[in-house]
Amino acid sequence: MPVPVAVQADPSRMVLRDTPQEKEPEEELKRLALKKAPPWVISCLLHMLLLIILGLWYITADPTKTGIFLDVSSPEMGEQLLDDSLSLSSDDLSIETAIVPPSELQAVEDPFASSKPEPTELALIGAKPMVNLDAPTINLALMGREPGTKEALLGKYGGNGESESAVKLGLAWLARYQRKDGSWSLKGPYRSGALNRRDLPESATAMALLAFQGAGNTHQRGEFQQQVAKGIKALLRMQGGNGNFFQQGDSNNWFYSHAQCTMAVCELYGMTKDEELRRPAELAIQFLIESQDPQLGGWRYLPRSDSDTSVTGWAVMAFQSARMAGLLVPSPVLAKIGEYLDQATPDGSQYGYQIATEPTLTMTADALLCRQYLGWRRDDPRLIAGADVVLKYLPRYEERDVYYWYYGTQMMHHMEGKYWPAWHAALRDMLVEHQEKSGAEKGSWDPKGEHPDRWANLGQGGRLYTTCLSLYMLEVYYRHLPIYGVRK
């Protein structure tokens, strides 16, 4: 089966300005040496000077760009960080795909709802030109996971020893339930697994890896290096030759699974720059690009067929992970997503599951996060109005909905201002308090209990799903840097 040509990336580029040098008086001996020197010596000196000047002079494609600086100043943490900016380009490529007709599928917001369309296959031959879309920040977002930076961000955004201990306990629980082949399952063998579905190792493995990686672990470093190394090998074994991460017989979680797997591979590549991960990441992104609904602009259950806000949200996060890793996404693809979101909202501030459906809190938080990643400014009136709506519905354990909380946590963290302190105050200690403290499930979050999670009531999600989303929320301080905290 033909596969895409790998995207060729240019190295990072920066503008270096020459600084004026003080002119020193010529000494008589130097003048005489130059005067008496043979012509070939003068020629060598001139060529050497030219090479030095060229070595210091990098030509940028966009001379209007300036350096990007991030302020993570915190009275508790002391010294902070600085960073450089990354800009990549690619060769022209092309892709052909098989077009799959629409199918009657149940409308659900849940990422693991059960319905089973017939499998399909995309024939990928190449990739379109990769062009960056100007957004508040792209390639700095993974820096927060680095030692030193991580501690600074914890202090700045409200993390503490208890929240970090909860993260370590949760990761230890995931490590205990990693299977011998390196994968994970959404069904078990832990208690309260997802019901009425197969193991879904693609989603389960990707979600576990994202939790480990969010805390700074990779296959090259970290307390859970071994688990990540085994997990990424297992995940790559699940990838098809044309880049897809779903298997024959899967239900309508196809693109949920594919987007989550794409996020995991792209983030790990971005954190390590391991070239063995670049090709799988590119193939996964290219498959997602060519699966976009050409009419509405989003994604749903089948390639190039229909759109909903829930699946589209995961696709946007996959693209953002790619961009953070330096793998650029065609700007027309991102612009088309914006066109879909324009149709899924009555006013730009609240969003429904599909076009012409009533807005919901979960889809509003999801879509507003997409808008942030697609370039909306923090002072956009529509973004502010939507964040004000979400602010009225802070997390409450009696109304558990980790899917809503997951999107709300990221969106509010990026908003900062009045939004993040209020949301965070309702979230952090509640998550820590209700984590399992003993027994075989120590470190996890029970999807059932006295106040079951919304998706546990439907037999969907399960303990690994609930635990991973809870870990993402407790890693929010450093998992992705707040995009509006970047000064250009």
Residue ranges and their predicted role:
Residues M1-E24:
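N-terminal intrinsically disordered, acidic low-complexity segments at the extreme N-terminus
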Residues D18-A37:
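Juxtamembrane low-complexity tails/linkers enriched in Ser/Thr-Pro and polybasic
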Residues L34-P38, L50-L54, T60-K488:
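Preference for long, amphipathic alpha-helical scaffolds in soluble/luminal domains
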Residues W40-I42:
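Residue-level marker of motif borders
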